[in-house]
Amino acid sequence: MSVIPYVIEQTGRGERMYDIYSRLLKDRIIFVGTPIESQMANTIVAQLLLLDSQNPDQEIQMYINCPGGEVYAGLAIYDTMRYIKAPVSTICVGIAMSMGSVLLMAGDKGKRLALPNSRIMIHQGSAGFRGNTPDLEVQAKEVLRLRDTLIDIYHRHTNLPHEKLLRDMERDYFMSPYEAQQYGLIDSVIEHTRQPEAAL
């Protein structure tokens, strides 16, 4: 179980305490830092809708350090990012894998960024099958439909041919941020703003 840090701020009415995610939300920053599942996705969708309703012209920053997760839940976040009027910038700060990479490339054109030591990975995803033969047939069709949906989404954002995407996504396909930029998943790599101090 993770511990959520709290921030104490001085206001005109005294001290106010926020959990770190609520404080970031005040500055229109959303942090995607866990595997994607339905409850987490509902929270991210609600945050996007709130910030869009508050000011549809002001940018939302989404920081991503995500190993992936459930496809349906991830698509709910993706669709909401593309639905709202507020511009969304995405920044990878560690990993953006599987559905995490879909969210990373869903940022507005020119606003999809990654830090220099981050890693991005795309693949087809996986599904566990259980049930009798008719159920397995239905599930197999749905997995193929989801695969085609994801390939269409990657194609829309990268302009790469469907055949290349299908080939690359047959296995885990890892990229540095510079490779992801060439691939079309992101627009630029954020270089460090501070240089390390020279060793004595």
Swiss-Prot record:
The protein's Enzyme Commission number: 3.4.21.92
Gene Ontology annotations for the cellular component aspect, listed alphabetically: cytoplasm; endopeptidase Clp complex
Keyword Cell cycle assigned: no
Domain of life of the source: Bacteria
Catalytic residues of the enzyme: S98 (nucleophile), H123
Subcellular location: Cytoplasm
MF GO annotations: ATP-dependent peptidase activity; ATPase binding; serine-type endopeptidase activity
Keywords: Cytoplasm, Hydrolase, Protease, Serine protease
InterPro entries, per the entry: ClpP, ClpP/crotonase-like_dom_sf, ClpP/TepA
Reaction catalyzed: Hydrolysis of proteins to small peptides in the presence of ATP and magnesium. alpha-casein is the usual test substrate. In the absence of ATP, only oligopeptides shorter than five residues are hydrolyzed (such as succinyl-Leu-Tyr-|-NHMec, and Leu-Tyr-Leu-|-Tyr-Trp, in which cleavage of the -Tyr-|-Leu- and -Tyr-|-Trp bonds also occurs)
HAMAP family in the record: ClpP (MF_00444)
Quaternary data: Fourteen ClpP subunits assemble into 2 heptameric rings which stack back to back to give a disk-like structure with a central cavity, resembling the structure of eukaryotic proteasomes.
Described purpose of this protein according to its UniProt entry: Cleaves peptides in various proteins in a process that requires ATP hydrolysis. Has a chymotrypsin-like activity. Plays a major role in the degradation of misfolded proteins.
Annotated family: Belongs to the peptidase S14 family.
Protein name: ATP-dependent Clp protease proteolytic subunit
Source organism phylogeny: Bacteria, Thermotogati, Deinococcota, Deinococci, Deinococcales
